[in-house]
Design a protein with these regions (language model features):
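Alpha-helical transmembrane segments and their membrane-interface boundaries
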Residues: 1-69, 113-121, 136, 150-158
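Hydrophobic transmembrane alpha-helices of secondary-active transporters
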Residues: 20-28, 78-86, 107-108
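Interfacial segments of multi-pass membrane proteins
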Residues: 29, 98-115
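Membrane-helix interface "capping/anchor" motifs
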Residues: 31-36, 85-97
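Alpha-helical transmembrane-segment detector that highlights a single hydrophobic TM helix
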Residues: 62-85, 89
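Alpha-helical transmembrane segments and their membrane-interface exit regions
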Residues: 77-80, 125-135
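Hydrophobic alpha-helical membrane segments of integral membrane proteins
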Residues: 94-99, 117-122
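Membrane-interfacial segments at transmembrane helix termini in multi-pass membrane proteins
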Residues: 131-150
């Protein structure tokens, strides 16, 4: 049976919420000039939301069906996020961006399945972690670099 106008409106609202909850995370990654940003994050969220809504629209969805939807989603988003991870000679970068892509996919699915409260928490915690823990991470890395320059192996060699 085709969806009603009311159902289409509700679906549009859900996808808009998923999009909006991903924007702050995408903005943060874009501002930091990361490989994924303002376009990627909302697209992942809205696609994940749409997939969850499609899965919920089956005549008699079972727990097993929901499980398979989530398994496929997590695998696919992991592949997308893996593209953000770069390995150089002695460093790895992009792990926070990759984890954020994965988180935004789950956020979108949460909205699609109707778990708004989970989506809001995922969005807020992800954004705050990126926004406020990044300066601490930089300070820790500077401490390690200073210790190496002094000839020690760690900051604890003092």
């Amino acid at each position: 049976m085709p969806p009603t106008i009311e159902q289409i409106g509700q679906d549009m609202i859900r996808m808009s919420i998923a999009y909006a909850l991903a924007l702050p995370i995408g903005w943060n990654r874009e501002r930091e000039a990361r490989s994924a940003g303002l376009r990627t994050f909302p697209i992942v969220a809205i696609a994940s939301c749409g997939l969850a809504m499609l899965g919920s629209s089956f005549a008699n969805p079972t727990a097993d069906a929901y499980s398979r939807i989530l398994q496929g989603l997590v695998t696919g988003i992991g592949f997308v996020g893996g593209g953000a991870i770069l390995r150089a000679k002695h460093s790895v970068s992009g792990t926070a961006t990759a984890a954020s892509v994965w988180n935004v996919g789950i956020l979108g699915a949460a909205v699609g399945f109707g778990y708004w409260h989970i989506a809001v928490v995922l969005s807020v915690v992800n954004f705050l972690t990126l926004q406020y823990l990044t300066p601490f991470k930089r300070e820790i890395h500077l401490g390690f670099e200073r210790a190496k320059e002094r000839g020690g192996d760690s900051m604890l060699d003092d």
